[in-house]
């Protein structure tokens, strides 16, 4: 069975807001956003740029990461985009199985 790799990405709008999403094809999805066929949240937001993308593996992990990143503050998202290691730390924290407590 063929395993599809999912990616997490952040798009920057003209007013410097960051939109977070997941996809199996970053180039295709970004083009959809640029042509108004993507998320409604990005329609009419002016020029868009791809600020960040990274492979995360399975869809379930991509969904968890998307949720966690959407909970971050703008400052925390900017640090993630800048490559401060927070993406890797988040990725690792979601990869580690929860500790079983007695």
Curated annotation (Swiss-Prot):
PANTHER family named among the record's database cross-references: UPF0213 PROTEIN YHBQ
UniProt xrefs under Pfam families: GIY-YIG
Protein name per UniProt: UPF0213 protein Ent638_3592
Annotated ranges, domain GIY-YIG: 4-79
Similarity comment text for this entry: Belongs to the UPF0213 family.
HAMAP family named in the record: UPF0213
């Amino acid at each position: 069975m063929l395993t599809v790799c999912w990616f997490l990405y952040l798009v920057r709008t003209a007013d410097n807001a960051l939109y977070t999403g997941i996809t199996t094809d970053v180039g295709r999805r970004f083009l959809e956003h640029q042509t108004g066929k993507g998320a409604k949240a990005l329609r009419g937001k002016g020029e868009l740029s791809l600020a960040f993308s990274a492979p995360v593996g399975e869809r379930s992990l991509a969904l968890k990461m998307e949720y966690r990143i959407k909970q971050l503050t703008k400052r925390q998202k900017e640090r993630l985009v800048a490559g401060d290691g927070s993406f890797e730390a988040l990725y690792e924290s979601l990869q580690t199985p929860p500790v079983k407590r007695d």
